[in-house]
């Protein structure tokens, strides 16, 4: 992954800075976004590439997932391409340097680049060493460290790569986590990132909890554990093993979840739609379907460093 990041960083010197059309500015989460299209969590896990990613055209960059405790993630290999499906399988396991280190890095970045940064979201998750029953305090620690420097907080309870994490999506388990994060948020916007594999009624329940707690939004969706409908040979998929699937195969379910959320949230909370977005037409369709902002990641891997630039041009 570091090699991929480095390749994209070097590409920045060869292209001009791209800014989305002024007509596409978006007012959301108490901020003015230079466009609706941002980079999803998972690429810049340690907040090392925020400014270069803005230079590539992303209006917002969601760093992480960050955990309170530094951790190496799962053993390699842990990231696999399925080119025939324009998809990735990852079981990274929240590898990151820990909330305190990453918060210090963002603080320094804000001091040295006060006007040249995108909107910065901090995606926070449970430390692997922490038991599920202690998750609220673990999320609290991450929120306390990152809230002073992030523009919004994204509570990730939907990665399939941390044991027990997805059990935290139930309303009963999620409520104390969100209460803890809210107490440490310094008033920064809080969004919940959900899995596409949740049953429809559970998605609606989470949306209602967001409204009840007067939180700021939902990010829909994370990766899926489903392998349905892939054209990649079964033996190749099985060789990749367990992990979250992202990319084009996620498109339809992610869009369906957006259609579920819109009538529940009714514009009272922001929806960031992510999953299977590759083109400006797809991004525009998500906006038309009720998303306030859209994100991508796997398309960045398959379509290269000019990907955001092309989408921004077409969204003008």
List PLM regions with ranges.
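Active-site glycine- and acidic-residue-rich loops that bind
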Residues: 127-139, 167, 192-212
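Catalytic cores of alpha/beta
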Residues: 46-55, 198-213, 262-267, 277-294
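An N-cap/entry alpha-helix motif that binds or orients negatively charged groups
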Residues: 1-26, 87-95, 99-100
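C-terminal helical cap(s) of enzyme catalytic domains, especially alpha/beta-barrels
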Residues: 70-86, 228-243, 299-316
């Amino acid at each position: 992954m570091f090699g991929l990041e480095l390749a994209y960083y070097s590409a920045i010197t060869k292209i001009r800075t791209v800014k989305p059309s002024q007509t596409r500015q978006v007012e959301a989460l108490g901020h003015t976004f230079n466009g609706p299209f941002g980079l999803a969590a998972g690429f810049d896990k340690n907040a090392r590439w925020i400014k270069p990613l803005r230079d590539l055209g992303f209006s917002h960059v969601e760093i992480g997932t960050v955990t309170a405790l530094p951790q190496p993630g799962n053993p390699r290999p842990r990231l696999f391409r399925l080119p025939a499906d324009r998809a990735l399988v990852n079981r990274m396991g929240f590898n990151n340097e820990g909330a305190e280190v990453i918060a210090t890095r963002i603080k320094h970045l804000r001091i040295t680049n006060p006007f040249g940064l995108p909107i910065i979201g901090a995606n926070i998750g449970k430390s692997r060493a922490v038991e599920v029953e202690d998750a609220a305090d673990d999320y609290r620690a991450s929120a306390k460290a990152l809230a002073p420097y992030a523009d919004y907080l994204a509570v990730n309870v939907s990665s399939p790569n941390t044991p027990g994490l997805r059990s935290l999506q139930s309303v009963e388990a999620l409520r104390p986590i969100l209460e803890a994060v809210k107490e440490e948020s310094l008033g920064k916007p809080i969004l919940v990132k959900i899995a596409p594999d949740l049953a429809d009624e559970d998605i609606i329940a989470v949306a209602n909890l967001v409204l009840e707690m007067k939180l700021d939004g939902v990010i829909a969706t994370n990766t899926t554990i489903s392998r349905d409908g892939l054209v990649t040979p079964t033996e190749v998929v099985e060789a990749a093993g367990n992990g979250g699937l992202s990319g084009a195969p996620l498109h339809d379910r992610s869009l369906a979840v957006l259609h579920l959320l819109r009538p529940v949230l009714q514009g009272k909370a922001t929806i960031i739609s992510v999953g299977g977005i590759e083109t400006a037409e797809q991004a525009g369709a998500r906006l038309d379907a009720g998303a306030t902002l859209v994100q991508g990641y796997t398309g960045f891997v398959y379509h290269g460093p000019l990907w955001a630039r092309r989408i921004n041009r077409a969204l003008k």
